[in-house]
């Protein structure tokens, strides 16, 4: 059985909150390894990658999002993040909504997905500012059955699963994203 949580002796930093004032959680996210993220995505019946505005500032995040799309993961791009994806030939299933609107759709039990084939069971988030994503993850945690996975460089306590806080080692963060993709 594969160990999920990040142990202190590993190359990954331990899970520490990026925003220490963000403490209103009854259960914190499990900090997970890249291979575990890949396995969760592979097991998902309806995965969705939601991309945020940080893609406009980080070309590598755009490249990773494109690779997720090439692996068959549909992308709901927030309005700003859709431009670099479309320029690379990616057709997001949604490209005009804000993260707030996407979150409202995902919470709606009658939502049939952006493609009309049913709601998503696993949603992965990439390219968001930590304080904005935190609020949306809290909402999804309390008002939906969706498995949420935060793969930004910030540990997100409101997600069900999250990368650990990687703000001090950008190259480790990129290598973790690549490891997820390599294992899909």
UniProtKB/Swiss-Prot annotation:
Transmembrane spans? none
* Gene3D superfamilies in alphabetical order: TPP-binding domain (3.40.50.1220)
Domain of life of the organism encoding this protein: Archaea
SUPFAM superfamilies, alphabetized: DHS-like NAD/FAD-binding domain
Listed GO biological process terms: methanogenesis, from acetate
* Known function: Part of a complex that catalyzes the reversible cleavage of acetyl-CoA, allowing autotrophic growth from CO(2). The alpha-epsilon subcomponent functions as a carbon monoxide dehydrogenase. The precise role of the epsilon subunit is unclear; it may have a stabilizing role within the alpha(2)epsilon(2) component and/or be involved in electron transfer to FAD during a potential FAD-mediated CO oxidation.
Q: Subunit info? A: Heterotetramer of two alpha and two epsilon subunits. The ACDS complex is made up of alpha, epsilon, beta, gamma and delta subunits with a probable stoichiometry of (alpha(2)epsilon(2))(4)-beta(8)-(gamma(1)delta(1))(8).
What protein family does this chain belong to?
Answer: Belongs to the CdhB family.
Q: What is this protein called?
A: Acetyl-CoA decarbonylase/synthase complex subunit epsilon 1
User: Species name for this entry?
Assistant: Archaeoglobus fulgidus (strain ATCC 49558 / DSM 4304 / JCM 9628 / NBRC 100126 / VC-16)
* Lineage start: Archaea, Methanobacteriati, Methanobacteriota, Archaeoglobi, Archaeoglobales
Gene it is expressed from: cdhB1
């Amino acid at each position: 059985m594969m160990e999920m949580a990040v142990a202190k002796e590993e190359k990954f930093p331990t899970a520490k909150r990026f925003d220490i004032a963000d403490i209103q959680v009854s259960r914190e996210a499990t900090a997970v390894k890249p291979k575990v993220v890949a396995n969760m995505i592979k097991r998902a019946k309806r995965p969705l990658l939601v991309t945020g505005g940080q893609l406009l500032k980080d070309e590598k995040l755009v490249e990773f999002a494109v690779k997720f799309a090439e692996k068959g993961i549909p992308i709901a791009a927030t309005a700003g993040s859709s431009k670099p994806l479309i320029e690379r030939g990616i057709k997001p299933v949604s490209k005009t909504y804000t993260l707030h609107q996407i979150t409202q759709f995902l919470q709606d039990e009658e939502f049939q997905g952006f493609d009309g084939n049913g709601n998503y069971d696993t949603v992965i988030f990439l390219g968001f500012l930590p304080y904005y994503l935190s609020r949306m993850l809290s909402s999804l945690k309390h008002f939906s059955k969706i498995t949420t996975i935060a793969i930004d460089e910030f540990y997100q306590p409101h997600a069900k699963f999250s990368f650990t806080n990687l703000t001090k080692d950008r190259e480790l963060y990129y290598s973790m994203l690549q490891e997820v993709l390599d294992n899909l």
